UniProtKB/Swiss-Prot annotation:
This is Aspartate 1-decarboxylase. Its main location: cytoplasm. Pfam families: Asp_decarbox (PF02261). It comes from Aquifex aeolicus (strain VF5). The lineage of its organism: Bacteria, Pseudomonadati, Aquificota, Aquificia, Aquificales. Its cofactor is pyruvate. One of its GO terms (cellular component) is cytosol. Its EC number is 4.1.1.11.
Length: 124
């Protein structure tokens, strides 16, 4: 049996822009994508802390170390510049893989720079 579990999470990102007329997706600093083990066009869940909106889209790389977090296309209706969001990705794991399972957790500052990166199943 496969279980779908959190693969990675980037916590409290600040939206830097929103472009309603772009084709779609979420543009994310390439460095943050690497830290969270996200590949271009990978499906992500986005949770808007400011307004409670939750939606799925896919991620595309923005310039490395830019801090860019841009909502594109229809997603631009679900958040605004300055909103705080969480990005989560999920994967399926076998029971054997779960024996050593730990999701990647990335915490950022107000400039979307990573301040803590850990792999943990600890629940606070």
């Amino acid at each position: 049996m496969l279980r779908e579990m959190l693969k990675s999470k980037i916590h409290r990102l600040t939206v830097t822009d929103a472009d309603l007329h772009y084709e779609g997706s979420l543009s994310l600093d390439e460095y943050l994508m690497e830290l969270a083990d996200l590949k271009p066009f990978e499906k992500i869940d986005v949770y808007n802390i400011n307004n409670g909106a939750r939606f799925q889209t896919y991620v595309i790389p923005a310039p490395r170390y830019s801090g860019e977090v841009k909502l594109n296309g229809a997603a631009a209706r679900l958040g605004h510049k300055g909103d705080l969001i969480i990005i989560a990705s999920y994967a399926q794991y076998t029971e054997e893989e779960l024996e050593n399972y730990a999701p990647k957790l990335i915490f950022v500052n107000e400039k979307n720079q990573p301040v803590e990166v850990k792999e943990s199943t600890e629940v606070k």
